[in-house]
Amino acid sequence: MIRANETNDCGGFFMDIDREKEGKCLTVTVPCYNSESYLERCVESLLKERDGLEIILVDDGSTDRTGQLADQYARAYPDVVRVVHKKNGGHGSGVNAGLMLANGIYFKVVDSDDWLDEAAFHKLMSVLRFWCRTKEEKRPDLVVCNYVYDHLEEGKTKAVRYGNLFPSKKSAGGTKSAVFRRNSILSCMR
């Protein structure tokens, strides 16, 4: 578990984190605020593909049991799940906190009220594991996937497809569907 620290210059987070988890292929950051009613579905969908996966649950100052649920996952899956508890700073600050602590070669954000289809996530992880085994200079900076947006309250479903957006020889696959190479994002922040 990582707690915010007001005294350093990295957005308030300890940067002397455990680096033994390096070598993960994908870090998924889940920004959470008062997510206790749906966090379990989100995390359980991610845990179906633990090999090469790091999950960072960022509790953004929740006032419900979100933080305790996140801590339970970290205790149950210590090699996969890490938790950050921080003062409420909004969705973007939660994403940034996860990015700063990520060890994966690739980085993805999954909102706490979202979940991943098991077959689709398996296919994505298979592709990412392939790229993670290749030489760094050959890895794509961005992998984009189709996704389905289910608006449960309205009973509406919308499939979002990216097939014709990229040249076919140049693509490997909104941030809902994007997986970024972590170092590519960090280089933009320097």
Which residues fall in each region the model found?
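Nucleotide-sugar donor-binding/catalytic module of glycosyltransferases
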Residues: I2, E6-R190
